[in-house]
């Protein structure tokens, strides 16, 4: 995906402006639509230390997939697979990448799917978010999880919304970015709480069910 001059400048400037520009990238929705009676195969890559990746981030990505699957029972039969066989693939953006999250459509054995790229480096999101992530591991993990959830939503065919209650909200519409993440983080007590706190709004659930009806 091309990155605009403004987005590159915002990243260089740091702070919440950079965060907003990076999160607001208009990732197009993939053409993957509806249940096709085949498992939804997925692959979660390892990341490099310079990318900000931590080994436990792979579990956050799995939890995000499971949250979408729970939202539409029986429709998304998740199955781990080799990279070359996976319909949905999750990667961790390198440190020199100018995007925060991105989804790229791909085709696997004739099935339409997506490669998802996640930035795990909190320092790239500005001083306030970076410092808070160092003090509070759950803050960092909340952001990584929500980013996975958002980009995997694109992989499942969902586009952006203008409602800040939605995980598919587009930050280009404005709003308090720190508060957006804090609203999810605040009720969490342990990391395991993330697995049961989907982060999906009623509208998110309705939209994914329209594309992938429960069975």
Model-derived regions, located:
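Disordered inhibitory propeptide/activation segment of secreted metzincin zinc metalloprotease zymogens
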Residues: 2-55, 65, 98, 102-109, ...
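Acidic/histidine-rich, surface-exposed loop or edge segments in extracytoplasmic proteins
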Residues: 36-51, 122-129, 185-191
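Divalent metal-coordination and catalytic microenvironments
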Residues: 42, 68, 150-153, 168, ...
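Residue-level detector of alpha-helix boundaries and kinks
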Residues: 52-53, 137, 192-193
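Metzincin-family zinc-dependent endopeptidase catalytic domain
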Residues: 57-163, 173-176
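Extracellular (secreted or membrane-anchored) zinc-dependent metallopeptidases
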Residues: 164-215
């Amino acid at each position: 995906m091309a990155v605009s001059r403004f987005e590159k400048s915002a990243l260089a400037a740091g702070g919440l402006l950079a965060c907003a520009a990076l999160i607001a990238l208009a990732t197009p929705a993939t053409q993957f639509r509806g249940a096709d009676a085949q498992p939804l195969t997925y692959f979660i890559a390892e990341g490099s230390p310079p990318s900000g990746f931590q080994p436990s981030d792979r579990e956050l990505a799995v939890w995000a997939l499971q949250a979408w699957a729970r939202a539409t029972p029986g429709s998304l039969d998740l199955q781990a697979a080799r990279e070359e066989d996976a319909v949905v693939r999750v990667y961790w953006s390198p440190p020199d990448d100018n995007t925060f999250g991105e989804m790229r459509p791909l085709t696997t054995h004739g099935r339409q799917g997506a490669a998802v790229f996640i930035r795990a480096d909190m320092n790239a999101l500005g001083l306030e978010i970076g410092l808070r992530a160092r003090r509070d591991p759950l803050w960092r993990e909340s952001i990584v999880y929500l980013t996975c959830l958002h980009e995997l939503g694109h992989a499942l065919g969902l586009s952006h919304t203008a409602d800040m209650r939605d995980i598919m909200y587009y930050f280009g519409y404005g709003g308090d970015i720190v508060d957006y993440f804090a609203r999810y983080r605040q009720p969490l007590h342990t990391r395991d709480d993330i697995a049961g706190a989907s982060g999906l709004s009623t509208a998110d659930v309705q939209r994914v069910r329209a594309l992938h009806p429960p069975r």
